Amino acid sequence: MTEPNRARKTRQRTAFAAPDQRTAPRRGALALRPLVFAVAGVWTAASAAQSQGATQQAASAQAPSSAASVTALAVSGPTTPGGAPLVPKMAEPVKRPDNAVPSFAAADAMDGRTNEDIHLRGHGELRRNGTVVKGDTLDYNQDTDFATATGNVRLFRDGTLVTGPDAALKVTANEGTMHTPSYEFHTVGGRGSAERIDFIDKDNSRITKGTYTTCSPDNVDWYFSASQIDIDSDRQVGSGRAGVLHFLGMPVFASPVFDFPLNDERRSGFLAPVFGYSSRSGADVTLPYYFNIAPNRDLTLYPRLLSQRGLQLGAEYRYLSQTYNGVLRGEFLPNDREADRNRWSIALVHNQRLATGLNAYVNYNKVSDSTYPDDLGRSIVTATQRQYTQEGGVTYSIGDWVALARVQKFQTLSTATTALSPPYERVPQLNLSYNRYDVGGFDINFQTDYTKFSIPTENTVQGERLFMQPTISYPIIRPGWFVTPKFILNTTSYRLDRPTGDTQASQINRTLPTVSLDSGLTFERDTPLVSKWFGRSYIQTLEPRLFYVYTPFRDQSQIPLFDTAQSDYNLGQIFTENPYTGYDRIADNNKLTAGVTTRFIESETGIERLRATLAQRLDFEGQRVTLAGSAPTSVRRYSDLLGATTIQMFRGIFFDTNLQYNQDIDRIMRSTMAFSWKPDANKVINLGYRYYRADANTGQLALEQTDISAQWPLTRRLYGLGRIGYDMDAKKPSDMLLGFEYVADCWVGRLAVQRYSNATSGYTTHIFAQIEFKGLSKVGNNPIDVIRLNVPGYQPVTAQPVTPSVLDQYE
């Protein structure tokens, strides 16, 4: 609020103590310059140009005998020739209880009776105990602490400003009434108006026929109205009756009773409804109810109505303590009208600290049938899940030792069009590892693992496996080069239960040593030409690397594959000792891998702007160990050539490519490319390409796909986003997403449609629609997680409120 002109001749300021702090008066004097004086605990600062009546009143004023009963005003006054003030600076007041807190008054003109009341005329202002009352006229009774104000009344307390034509209240007790008020909550940026507001006490108030919005006054796109709203500042909660949400001039939601928090603390009550649509289930409406059981426990019930299937009941219970935490979630759909059976799911994640270094955990997930995620999943993430883990275990760590004991099972979902074989279950697995670095320059590692494997498939080998692997290496790292010799001993013992008719050995022992030598050099140079092109100083590196590994051949064709698969062939795998995961296959090796990397690094920041790598492996003898156990159909001396490049030379531009090239057949076996341009916030364009050539040796299926995704502003407030993935082999889209976001100063609207192929050789379509009312709630089905998954670099737009002035909250 603009402060009235301080040069007004009648502008007066007064500070007076509480009635019970009055002291005996004494005579005072009047100075030509502004001075401070008091009458029975009342100080007044007046200018020399005061009216004659005001001057006479000031001349007869008296000062208190004790400075402790008053509060000083910062007023400039006359000084002696030596610079000492004629009016001495008053001591800092001692803290008083609320009933003894001083009051401050200011107005163009004031009058009143000593120790009884004061009348303010023209820009009246009263301050007491954190409350500010302003009005054209203001009357205040010191004995009753009662104030009445009329004309442009402003009441400010604890970050809340209430304005209206009149007000009557007890200032300290915050008891009173204001008619046709408007209010602003500066801490949350909300505002509204009402027919009446009653201040019940310091913590409670009641709003009659009130509204609330976070929109600017000249653009109220939405507001919430209610016949009655009760505010409890102590509990930081509000409640009301007959609430209606209006959006763009239309009522869109109503509730007979409601409650809401005044801060970020959790409160029990209904959450915003979630709306959606799925081609497999129809219209989808969820109305969650939240129970704030305790600060460390809560429960959410979420009944979900599916128009084509029925009513699904769901619940999620969360708990947390110093020694444990977890989440229990369950869903139940009785008598699904489409499937004609009950559908359900359950999930439990629990973590427990039993003692120092000793922890336990449970991760259990199960669904009623194989099509549950397709029919009832809310997004492509859940709809494509085909394996559910059911696991529990204990871990213990002390020093360099780590132990694990667990039982791990799986639920595998197979459909008529997607037949999946279940993996082996670990019932149980016991694992012990030891890691110690720099023991006289040596790094020591020891792994031992015992697992009993079981599988719910008939006529399939099962059994037990004991694996031990000590490793010792001696890294020699110097500026510009490194050499790391390593020795590994792989020892494995099997005891197998083979199906009837299988005559292979039931007990197998295997011991294989492995030696490797890893080495590399690093050269650096300045690049004045590149630095000139890009306007920055760059350093280029050249980093050649050689890696040799030797493992003798051992026939492993009789060993089953419990948990072993071919590692993905890439620049990380080509510099390792074994191309297989798990412990069931140890490849015979007599191989040398050569690679070279060059990097461009900004000299000042150390940011890597470009990296390019080439690598290839030379096989001196030809690997004979395969996953199938049979000898390979052909032996290759040279592996596929691997290349990779990452470039981010320009602001917001990123390019990455990987290539796998087979020299023997002169064919590209694998190629991936990714391009991203992100010039600014909420602006991104992504291009992607993936090509995999069919390979019988690795089981790789042919694949060729491309995709494009983007988020881009179409207007100042409207943003478009989308993605399309195209299968070039099938000549049809594999997945699509199209969406829009509209951002206003107090709300954001989001609409997205997603379509993807499902496990039954069809397509599933989801529609997401959400409106986010700033400072109130979100209504609809949140598409943000789905968009983030489909559009890399996506940033949700947020409401753009009018930037407040630094003086907006000044009273």
Curated annotation (Swiss-Prot):
Protein location: Cell outer membrane
Keyword annotations: Cell outer membrane, Membrane, Signal
Signal peptide region: 1-17
Membrane as UniProt keyword: yes
UniProt-annotated stretches for the region Disordered: 1-22
GO biological process: Gram-negative-bacterium-type cell outer membrane assembly; lipopolysaccharide transport
InterPro entries to which the protein is assigned, alphabetical: LipoPS_assembly_LptD, LptD, LptD_C
One Pfam family in the UniProt entry: LptD
Bridged cysteine pairs (disulfide): none
GO cellular component term, pick one: transporter complex
Assembly behavior: Component of the lipopolysaccharide transport and assembly complex. Interacts with LptE and LptA.
Function: Together with LptE, is involved in the assembly of lipopolysaccharide (LPS) at the surface of the outer membrane.
Recorded family membership: Belongs to the LptD family.
Name of this protein: LPS-assembly protein LptD
Species of origin: Ralstonia nicotianae (strain ATCC BAA-1114 / GMI1000)
